[in-house]
Amino acid sequence: YVFEVIQNSNFAQEVHESFMDLAVGTGILAVNEGDAVHPIQFNAIPLPHVVLDIGHDDNIDHVFRVRHARCDQLMLMYPKAQLSETLKKKCQKEPDAKIEILEVVCKDYTVKNDDGSALYAIVMESKEVIFQEQYKGVGSNPYVCFRWAKCAGEVYGRGPLVNALSAIKTTNLTIELVLENAQM
């Protein structure tokens, strides 16, 4: 059943986009609950939209993501959100107003011998937590973060693009010098 659900989801498209980011060194895939038709929704997250942090065991345990949404989308993104009266009034008055949200997923280190993560959604303007959710069990982080290669203590991976960057710069400089000499 699991493979059927994944096969009928948008996994193939989104993992392809994540693999394109993996060329730089790190790919990120968000796994979200869907609906009855699509039980699982995947979303490739571009690397510039997140900040990753490692825990004491060198695993990526913390994901910080800035999102922008219209007021009328808040309850669709976070159905169990607790909005303050000020935010409710703002959303009623200006449903198209953009809200900046910091989404934080962090590993729960308080529970021994079990994995757990917590998701927090914070409105940046007022610094209020509008949504929080606990995830329990192995693989409970809703973000799948994968790296091409890394050295000890590094958060982000080193992909083939990073390794080829010096060769690309040298090639560009060589072409530039050839073109300059051709003009003489």
Descriptions of predicted regions:
Residues 1-184:
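Extended alpha-helical, oligomerization-prone segments that build pores/tubes and scaffolds
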